[in-house]
């Protein structure tokens, strides 16, 4: 057991993230739940969750080929999570506002016209860019984030515990599609080929390992397909 998880406000989520292979221990005894997440760490985890295998062009990032994160950055570029302008902040702690954008891009939860009025309750959202405002509004409206102390604290670095919490509020099940039998929860990320018949479910995300998907008489809150081999 990790010594710094017991009694933590996100204890259950942290254990689940570890069991699911989403988060790893910081060392043999700790998970460092209050430690900040860097941009490249966030992208690496999201690409792991979505089983991204394609590699984008990272020649403009000037990353040493032997850097541990070189392939993860290439996956992030391929998945549309990273752009050239992010090259200078890959190893910086990711602010909560930027993390909201990443989650929105990864799970495609930001609609064309989200209700921006939901941000009026937070005094620190008045000067957001359009992209930041849309991502924050979509997550607030969906009940994924609610702020702390009356504010969204968009400039504060996101912690590992917060990252796991937002992730599991978006989707709390990560399984092969062939094993899917319906799920009542926040959502499911499914990998591989799928044939789902006669189910009423929440949100479904098919990751980039899916290539053959058949849905018959399925009622879902939303269905997002990130596969590129259909």
What are these regions (language model features)?
Residues 136:
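Catalytic cores of secreted/periplasmic or lumenal enzymes
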Residues 178-198, 202-230:
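Short, T/G/N/S-enriched strand-turn elements that build extracellular solenoid repeat scaffolds
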Residues 1-11, 19, 24-97, 103-133, ...:
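Feature responds to low-complexity, polar/acidic, surface-exposed segments characteristic
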């Amino acid at each position: 057991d990790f010594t710094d998880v017991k009694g933590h406000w996100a204890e259950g989520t942290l254990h689940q993230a570890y069991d699911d292979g989403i988060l790893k221990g910081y060392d043999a005894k700790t998970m460092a739940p209050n430690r900040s997440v860097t941009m490249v760490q966030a992208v690496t985890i999201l690409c792991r969750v979505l089983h991204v295998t394609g590699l984008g062009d990272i020649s403009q990032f000037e990353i040493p080929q032997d850097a541990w994160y070189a392939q993860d950055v290439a996956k992030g570029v391929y998945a549309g999570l990273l752009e050239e302008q992010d090259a200078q902040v890959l190893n910086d702690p990711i602010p909560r506002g930027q993390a909201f954008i990443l989650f929105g891009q990864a799970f495609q939860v930001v609609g064309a016209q989200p209700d921006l009025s939901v941000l009026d309750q937070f005094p620190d959202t008045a000067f957001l860019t359009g992209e930041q405002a849309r991502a924050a509004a979509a997550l607030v409206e969906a009940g994924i984030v609610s702020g702390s102390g009356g504010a969204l604290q968009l400039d504060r670095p996101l912690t590992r515990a917060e990252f796991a919490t937002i992730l599991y509020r978006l989707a709390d099940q990560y399984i092969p599609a062939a094993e899917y039998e319906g799920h009542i929860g926040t959502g499911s990320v499914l990998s591989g080929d799928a044939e789902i018949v006669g189910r009423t479910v929440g949100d479904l995300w098919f990751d980039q390992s899916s290539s053959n998907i058949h849905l018959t008489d399925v009622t879902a809150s939303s269905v997002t397909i990130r596969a590129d081999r259909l």
